[in-house]
From Swiss-Prot:
Organism lineage: Bacteria, Pseudomonadati, Pseudomonadota, Gammaproteobacteria, Pseudomonadales
The keyword Iron belongs to this UniProt entry's keyword annotation: no
Subunit and interaction comment: Heterodimer of an alpha and a beta chain.
SMART domains: BHL
Organism annotation: Pseudomonas putida (strain W619)
Protein name: Integration host factor subunit beta
């Protein structure tokens, strides 16, 4: 599902807000979450999951075109850990719709 599809689905199911209002709310939420992660903060949404940063150590990679070894710097990458309620719900849905 894309962001546009999510916006459409929310507008269709709730009917009180316009498409522009839902789009603004989602864009604002995602921007605030991005800013929190960029400053190293952790985000926890109870029942859904948590977002944090994990450090990837420097390593030697390989250029796929040339096969040449390349030194890759260490970096932080976003990580999502689903909450128990989300995991349980996904597993219920999985059994209902294989």
């Amino acid at each position: 599902m894309t962001k546009s599809e999510l916006i459409e689905r929310i507008v269709t199911h709730q009917g009180l807000l316009s498409s522009k209002d839902v789009e603004l709310a989602i864009k604002t939420m995602l921007e605030q979450m991005s800013q929190c992660l960029a400053t190293g903060d952790r985000i926890e949404i109870r029942g859904f999951g948590s977002f944090s940063l994990h450090y990837r150590a420097p390593r030697v990679g390989r250029n796929p075109k040339t096969g040449q070894s390349v030194e890759l710097e260490g970096k932080f990458v976003p990580h999502f850990k689903p909450g128990k309620e989300l995991r349980d719900r996904v597993n219920e849905e999985e059994h209902e719709h294989p």
